[in-house]
């Protein structure tokens, strides 16, 4: 998750969907890239997720506009989808005051030590304020829909458990609870209250952005579908990240998910029979299964992420072995 979006992400996604969904949506494979069409990345999936209005923070090329990147794939017969982060992304124009004349780097997630948690250079994990959500809707969602894209993926609604000390979080606390902020490390009750607010903030963020996307799309005669790419709750508990994932079934604006399971999540060591070690296949099986269970009562669409590499540098034998393990777990 933390560095998996390289210059070009060639992770192909296979989908498990109900029979009724298949009659409405024939997209079964898709992949993400922040780049324009190139022969080297044309893998003939059903669709492509063009990443970011401004690209991906890790992609330093940024030679073509979003509209030109969309056009290059559409000319090759691809169905075009859009993907960006809701907790981090290429949003420097917001943080540096180009959006409303005010700097917003103070809206990052901050630890007890006073350190901002960064996803990359000038890319903090965000406390999603109402102002930030307005920016996302006006600067990103509108532009994407204006370009004719009718499927939006807002990935990784994540609030780190160790965060919760920024001024922006304290303001959200006061608005939500009606009393002053309390440091989460001082009591179990404070920890609960802090986590509850973190959960709510990204639940609200997805609801507001997706509801806006659907309404704006409808005004232009489009039926916009909205998806949440997210890690499993198995992984979030291991990495100590708060996510509203368990409540997404209650949001009518959510049409489906991507199960972000790959070697990086599944090789996290865990305990069995008193022994702590990597169990990539077993963990991946639990991760995919826990996410597939989210669709049982709703019939929503679920894509399974499959990625041949991971965040950290390993040798290719290691990549291959664990890629095969996660793929088999599907």
Question: Where is each model-derived feature located?
Answer:
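Active-site-proximal loop/short-helix segments
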Residues: 154-190, 229-235
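Active-site-adjacent "subsite" loops/lids of carbohydrate-active enzymes
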Residues: 82, 86-147, 181-199, 207
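Glycine-rich, aromatic-flanked loop segments that form ligand/cofactor-binding clefts
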Residues: 65-119, 151-161, 213, 217-228
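Bacterial Sec-dependent N-terminal signal peptides
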Residues: 1-23
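Aromatic-lined carbohydrate-recognition surfaces of secreted/lumenal glycan-active proteins
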Residues: 25-33, 81-85, 153-157, 192-241, ...
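Catalytic domains of carbohydrate-active enzymes, especially glycoside hydrolases
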Residues: 27-61, 65-68, 142-151, 252-257, ...
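The substrate-binding groove and active-site-proximal loops of carbohydrate-active enzymes
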Residues: 49-61, 117-135, 187-205, 230-232, ...
């Amino acid at each position: 998750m933390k560095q998996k979006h390289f210059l070009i992400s060639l992770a192909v996604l296979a989908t498990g969907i109900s029979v009724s969904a298949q009659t409405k949506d024939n997209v079964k494979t898709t992949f993400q890239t922040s780049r324009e069409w190139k022969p080297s990345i044309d893998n003939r999936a059903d669709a492509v997720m063009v990443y970011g209005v401004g690209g991906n923070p890790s992609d330093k090329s940024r030679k073509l506009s979003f509209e030109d990147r969309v056009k290059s794939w559409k000319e090759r017969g691809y169905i075009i989808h859009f993907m960006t982060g809701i907790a981090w992304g290429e949003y420097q124009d917001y943080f540096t005051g180009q959006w409303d004349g005010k700097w917003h780097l103070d809206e990052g997630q901050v630890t007890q030590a006073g350190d901002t948690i960064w996803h990359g250079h000038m890319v903090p994990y965000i406390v999603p304020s109402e102002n930030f959500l307005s920016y996302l809707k006006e600067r990103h969602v509108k532009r994407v829909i204006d370009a004719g894209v009718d499927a939006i993926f807002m990935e990784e609604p994540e609030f780190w458990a160790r965060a919760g000390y920024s001024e922006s979080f304290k303001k959200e606390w006061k608005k939500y609870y009606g009393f002053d902020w309390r440091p989460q490390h001082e009591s179990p009750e404070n920890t609960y209250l802090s986590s509850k607010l973190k959960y709510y903030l990204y639940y609200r963020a997805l609801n507001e952005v997706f509801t806006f996307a659907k309404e704006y799309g409808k005004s232009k005669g489009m039926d916009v579908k909205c998806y949440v790419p997210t890690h499993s709750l198995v992984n979030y508990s291991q990495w100590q990240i708060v996510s509203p994932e368990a409540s997404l079934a209650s949001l009518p604006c959510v049409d489906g998910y991507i199960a972000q399971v790959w070697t990086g999540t599944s090789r996290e060591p865990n305990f069995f029979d008193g022994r702590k070690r990597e169990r990539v296949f077993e963990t991946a099986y639990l991760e995919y299964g826990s996410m597939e269970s989210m669709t049982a009562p709703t019939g929503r669409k679920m894509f399974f992420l499959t990625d041949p590499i991971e965040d950290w540098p390993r040798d290719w034998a290691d990549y291959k072995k664990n890629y095969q393990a996660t793929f088999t777990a599907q």
